[in-house]
């Protein structure tokens, strides 16, 4: 009976330790930054080494410290044109962040209400009826909580193909795989986070309907021109002489495609221009974009009750002052990966643009967030869980060993008369 009780106690304590080790990993307990806190030069050097060693394609990075550009670096594939501060990269889903800024500017101008149904503003196309009681609001589309289920499967277009109109893309979107893509509301709007590229195609239409001009022109007039972002465009840019081609993971030039879903994935921009935009969004700038940025950081998309998404941007980790490190990442085939992170507490930021590696920009962004805050970011779940394995196993070994030793030294023995002694 004593052995059974000890065994059950060992299982209980082991389970409690394993759960604690796992939960603690999400608070960064088992992780260490790659350089000391405050060592911006050290982190820049780490970024340089990572890009030089791990990526065979093109890449660029820019580090902002205390509201000023601190460092930058540019790396070119063998035989490729040199990359510089003005080289445009395809940003993939980071495009959504800029689109969301455009939507929030319309809110700032009083032309759009986040809490009105999106169909209230649409005339050229409307979201189909659904079975749920809540309408799809503008804020739902921004925060991926609209209930839309579109499979993320929007296909690319060959360079010799004509792009469909916005209405054609909404009515008959091209799928990237064998599964068709349709706009279906499958969950009660406003109740669950479900990443939706299609929601940003609807926001593209919303911007056009509310502003009265084309999406590309609106972003150009409202964001790019005021910030002197001359190396940013939602128009296909591969004909530009200083646009990076797409590379695969082996450093070979890959086929370039066009995107019909401009608002979700069609932006190309330089590291220098993204630096200008990041600086304009920071508290130190005290501009209308600073107010927009503050409104975008309000948690709107939750997972397991924890803040994951604001109004168009990722909330990577909580800062020391209770705000959020924010920004957006992007990824596309064959090996496009981009990352942008801003810490409003310190007016620091990092921008990493990569073509030739599927996850390197996101990894560097994760290390930057850990270095800035001591917490892992929300995109690093695999790294977080992996960090808990070693302390979990060490703890389990010590727990089991303790119970075994206790059982050994408290086991019944026989005295010289043959009587059991406890």
Placement of each model-derived feature along the sequence:
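Extracytoplasmic/periplasmic, Sec-exported soluble proteins
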Residues: 35-42, 53-55, 59, 83-98, ...
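Short, surface-exposed loop or secondary-structure junction motifs
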Residues: 130-327, 333
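Short, solvent-exposed turn/loop segments enriched in Gly/Ser/Thr/Pro and often Arg
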Residues: 65, 69, 118, 234-241
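Catalytic loop of the DD-peptidase/beta-lactamase superfamily, centered on the K-T-G motif
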Residues: 2-74, 255-422
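Active-site-proximal loop and beta-strand segments within enzyme catalytic domains
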Residues: 17-28, 71, 79-196, 361
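Extracytoplasmic/secreted proteins, especially bacterial periplasmic and envelope-associated proteins
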Residues: 42, 46, 93, 98, ...
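Surface-exposed beta-strand edges and their flanking turn/coil or helix-capping segments
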Residues: 84-88, 104, 127, 156, ...
